[in-house]
């Protein structure tokens, strides 16, 4: 599969960041987790009660979404319509569910809309 153009990637990444934002907001409401969600441009920040954060941003030159969490730094690349970890192959929402659960201390399952 050829790489996307820069504008194609930016549109795809922007849509995915919006989807993540909506998904986290909905899941947090369902389990009464207190997560502050903020977005500025291509950076989505999730802040938890203990002050810890998860930061998700798009990296256009690499055509990846990068996630910084207490568990570490992770790179996700689009593959067959899904964002997968470039090292482990884990799907983005599975990984984010674990990171959000760890940092919120509430069992959170994220399912993309």
UniProtKB/Swiss-Prot annotation:
A Pfam family that the UniProt record links to this protein: Frataxin_Cyay
GO biological process: iron-sulfur cluster assembly
MF annotations from Gene Ontology: ferric iron binding; ferrous iron binding
PROSITE patterns: FRATAXIN_1, FRATAXIN_2
Claim: Metal-binding is one of the keywords in the record: yes
GO (cellular component) term, any one: cytosol
Keyword terms of this UniProt record: Iron, Metal-binding
Family recorded in the similarity comment: Belongs to the frataxin family.
NCBIfam families: FeS_CyaY (TIGR03421)
Function in brief: Involved in iron-sulfur (Fe-S) cluster assembly. May act as a regulator of Fe-S biogenesis.
The protein's name: Iron-sulfur cluster assembly protein CyaY
Organism: Ralstonia nicotianae (strain ATCC BAA-1114 / GMI1000) (Ralstonia solanacearum)
Underlying gene: cyaY
């Amino acid at each position: 599969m050829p790489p996307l153009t820069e504008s194609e990637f930016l549109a795809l990444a922007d849509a995915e960041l919006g989807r993540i934002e909506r998904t986290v907001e909905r899941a947090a409401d369902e389990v009464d987790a207190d997560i502050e969600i903020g977005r500025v441009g291509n950076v989505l920040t999730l802040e938890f009660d203990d002050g810890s954060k998860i930061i998700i941003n798009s990296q256009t030159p690499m055509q990846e979404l990068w996630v910084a969490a207490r568990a570490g730094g992770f790179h996700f690349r689009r593959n067959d319509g899904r964002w997968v970890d470039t090292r482990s192959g884990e799907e983005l929402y599975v990984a984010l569910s674990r990171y959000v659960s760890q940092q919120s201390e509430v069992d959170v399952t994220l399912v993309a809309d």
